[in-house]
Amino acid sequence: MAYIYETHLHTCQASACGRSPGRDYIQRYIDAGYSGIIVTDHFYRGNCRIDRSLPWRDFIDRFCAGYEDARNEGEKRGFPVFFGWEENFDGDEYLIYGLDKAWMLRHPEMPTWTRKQQYEIVRAAGGCVVQAHPFRARDYNHTIYLSHALCDGVEVYNAGNEPDWNRLAMRYAKIIGLPVTAGSDNHCADTMQPDRLAGVCFDKPLEDIQGYVAAILNRQTFSLHLPVALEPWNGSVAPDLPCRWLDREGEDTGRDIMEILRRGTPAEK
């Protein structure tokens, strides 16, 4: 039996782009055959709905409301709901897993972190970082930043992406040798279509979010749940935006992204 989990989902309580409260997703994911979801609302520097002028405790309380709404409904129905978030830097976004509300309350400096600080502090606390939809080109980003040394995995299939962006992400992940994930990037329970959802599959159910973190960090075997097959990159499709290949300090290396993609040159961490 396959246990399918959603890894990328937004609620209207915390994400400005979210269209549904957390509780509305539960029965729909049960009906779609999922075994659990991870709520990953947009955090401070992303498309967050919460007033950033609030005191830190109030900000975090409100930020976690969508997750808590989903969790409470999930508990009523015996459906696991785990916590995460999505943070933005310069259009490049990262899914954070394995930490909780209490931890966030102890870190009011989070909005000032660099990519490097985020990675090092999250890892030291027992969490992990996955770069979301790395080749996405939207009106909110003008450059693609590839942070291979400052993440633990790559979201290679995002249901909100153009197919070429996902193909580029898979090629990139194979070159750098990081675990790959998939997610729906779901924003609305009312319009979600089961045959378009994505996620990850395990042979055994996840007991908690740490099980997912361990699977990524320890490179345990799990598969991707995809609505369509992810075709390989054909060598000719280029990113839609200028790319910056960042080093372990978060600085631009000046490397040619297309050369790396075509030659398959491994990157040093």
Regions found by a protein language model. Give the residues of each.
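An N-terminally biased module of ancient metal coordination in phosphate/nucleic-acid-related enzymes
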Residues: 1-88, 148-149, 163, 188-190, ...
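Charged catalytic cores and adjacent phosphate/nucleic-acid-binding surfaces used
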Residues: 1-7, 11, 21-27, 91-102, ...
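C-terminal active-site-proximal or functional interface alpha/beta core segments in diverse enzymes
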Residues: 60-64, 104, 108-120
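Short, flexible loop segments at the rims of nucleotide/cofactor-binding pockets, characterized by
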Residues: 13-16, 59, 105-109, 131-134, ...
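Conserved beta-strand positions in the central sheet of alpha/beta enzyme cores
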Residues: 38-39, 130-131, 155
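Generic beta-sheet signal
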Residues: 84, 132, 183-184
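Surface-exposed amphipathic alpha-helices with a cationic face
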Residues: 4, 30, 71-75, 116-130, ...
